[in-house]
Amino acid sequence: SSDLIYLDGETELEKVKENNQALKRLALRKEEWLKTYQFLLMKAGQTEPLQANHQFTPDAIALLSVFIVEELFKEEEITILEMGSGMGILGATFLTSLDKKVDYLGMEVDDLLIDLAASMADVIGLQAGFVQGDAVRPQMLKESDVVISDLPVGYYPDDAVASRHQVASSQEHTYAHHLLMEQGLKYLKSDGYAIFLAPSDLLTSPQSDLLKGWLKEEASLVAMISLPENLFASAKQSKTIFILQKKSEIAVEPFVYPLASLQDANVLMKFKENFQKWTQGTEI
């Protein structure tokens, strides 16, 4: 069945279980395991290049996302839904680096990637839940504090499913990343935050008028953090972190910040100070 839920790395394959047990005996720390997986996936990608939407979120961006969530939420416990969780690297980064008790659920349509993510979580010893499903289609999910996604970019092939969404195009296939943003907001608590890694030209690209129409009615764009272009294969593929909330009566002055580097400690420190000021309601 396509709706199988894999929790805590459970799987039917005995061989996988045996391999996982052997790996656990190496007794690495969680952070060491995560770095090992990232290294192996990078090496594998050099010999067998991954399609763009299967590549994992770069470590620096994942850690930046952790910082953002730490600043936005002061609570000790937090629920996170990741849409299009892929190999589970972003989720694993939250579970190993976030200084909170995390209830994490990753949703992914690709059964192979789900198996890989669940197996990795099992070996590292992470309490992670995964569900297989098309994140554009409605799912029975509880609302979360955080909905996060490194959005897959491209056209969504099923026009009938797309047509149920406000961002749907009547002229052509609808952008999948627009559909995921609209659907993702439905799983967000009223005071939660949706954090989307999306193309930098999101608000000016084709179909952007449809997206902006939906944004105006249903969401508040509270922050835009553009990422350094050198992180991406080309300037055209550059991405920005867009932070959204459900529409509310309280107007928030958006935080707009061009992040010039993720390697330069001074640049990062300045960004962190500015973001902290913004979250505390201080004029930047």
Predicted segment positions?
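A short acidic, Gly/Pro-enriched loop at the edge of an enzyme's catalytic core
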Residues: 137-148
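Mobile active-site "lid"/loop adjacent to the S-adenosyl-L-methionine
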Residues: 150-180, 201
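Conserved SAM-binding loop
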Residues: 117-118
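Conserved SAM-binding loop of SAM-dependent methyltransferases across substrates and taxa
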Residues: 87-101
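Conserved class I S-adenosyl-L-methionine
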Residues: 75-86
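Flexible, glycine-/basic-rich loop-and-beta segments that form/coincide
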Residues: 236-284
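Conserved Class I SAM-dependent methyltransferase catalytic core
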Residues: 173-230
